[in-house]
């Protein structure tokens, strides 16, 4: 064994630990089956191994070994494409789809998590080499918590206030409070909607929030998460029984209409609160306005 054996092993362990933690699945994530997880565990091991050998390779002046990082970057970009293509194909068979914005966010997350595994292994191994195995272990633990912090993005409750809305019909028009949702002409469908439907009002906390929830991809993510947890009272070929989110053009308030199988208002509010804010949906118009005012 060389002087770098234990530092590399510790780096790989912490890189893999970080990747395994970031692989945890819930109701909105993919992969949810063991075969999909095996692919990402294997790629996480490769990423951790690459990160762990970077510093020993530099010290030994084995600069050729560093070129493998370019191959790794190409491979991890393929992971992003694989996730995007897989989820896009799966999405066409969902009763309530994720939407392309949500899918792109998941694909980006899976690519970036491999890079986090590389950085975790690199930093841990470097600390082990230049200080000690104990210091390297402490640094690895800190990197693990940093990875945990990077996973915790903004949630819907951070940008809106959520309250229950009243479903009502004005003629053939379906409303959540005063926000128009869609036109339902058949009396039997109106009865089904009033019986099984639920409505919520999302009031943005500021102008940036109003612009963010106006994004169609963010709205679709809200509907998908609600339908995924609470179920959906519809089948294919039922356009009138389709969950929708519509906007009040005057103040940016969002009216959300869903048809859950499980009539749990408290659970629906909790799901709404934890809907992730999609990176591609975030808008900061006030930052531009402030710069112009100056």
Locate the predicted segments by residue.
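Long, charge-rich C-terminal accessory regions
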Residues: 138-270, 278-282, 288-294
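Alpha-helical transmembrane segments and their membrane-interface exit regions
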Residues: 16-21, 69-81, 140-151
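Select subsegments of transmembrane alpha-helices in polytopic membrane proteins
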Residues: 38-43, 105-118
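Alpha-helical transmembrane segments and their membrane-interface junctions
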Residues: 62, 66, 117-137
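Short membrane-interface loop/juxtamembrane segments of multi-pass integral membrane proteins
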Residues: 91-109
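A cytosolic-side transmembrane-helix exit/cap motif
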Residues: 82-95, 153-165
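Alpha-helical transmembrane segments
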Residues: 3-12, 58-76, 136-141
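Membrane-anchoring hydrophobic segments
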Residues: 1-61
């Amino acid at each position: 064994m060389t002087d770098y054996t234990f530092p590399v092993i510790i780096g790989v362990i912490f890189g893999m630990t970080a990747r395994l933690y970031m692989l945890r699945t819930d109701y909105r994530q993919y992969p949810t089956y063991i075969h999909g997880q095996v692919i990402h565990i294997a790629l996480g091991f490769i990423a951790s191994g690459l990160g762990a050998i970077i510093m020993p390779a530099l010290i030994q002046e084995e600069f050729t070994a560093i070129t493998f990082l370019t191959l790794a970057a190409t491979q991890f970009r393929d992971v992003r494409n694989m996730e995007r293509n897989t989820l896009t194909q799966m999405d066409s068979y969902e009763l309530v789809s994720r939407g392309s914005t949500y899918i792109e966010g998941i694909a980006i997350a899976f690519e970036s998590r491999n890079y986090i595994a590389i950085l975790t292994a690199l930093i841990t191994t470097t600390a082990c080499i230049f200080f000690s195995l104990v210091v390297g272990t402490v640094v690895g633990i800190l990197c693990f918590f940093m990875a945990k912090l990077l996973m915790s993005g903004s949630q819907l409750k951070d940008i809106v206030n959520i309250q229950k809305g009243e479903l009502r019909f004005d003629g053939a028009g379906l409303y959540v409070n005063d926000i128009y949702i869609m036109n339902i002409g058949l009396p039997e469908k109106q009865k089904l909607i009033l019986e099984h439907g639920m409505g919520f009002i999302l009031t943005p906390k500021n102008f940036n929030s109003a612009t963010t929830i106006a994004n169609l991809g963010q709205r679709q993510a809200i509907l998908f998460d609600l339908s995924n947890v609470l179920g959906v009272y519809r089948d294919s070929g039922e356009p009138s029984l389709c969950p929708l989110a519509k906007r009040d053009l005057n103040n940016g308030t969002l009216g959300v209409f869903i048809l859950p199988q499980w009539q749990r208002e408290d659970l629906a509010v909790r799901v709404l609160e934890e809907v992730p804010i999609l990176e591609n949906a975030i808008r900061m118009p006030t930052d531009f306005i402030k710069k112009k005012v100056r």
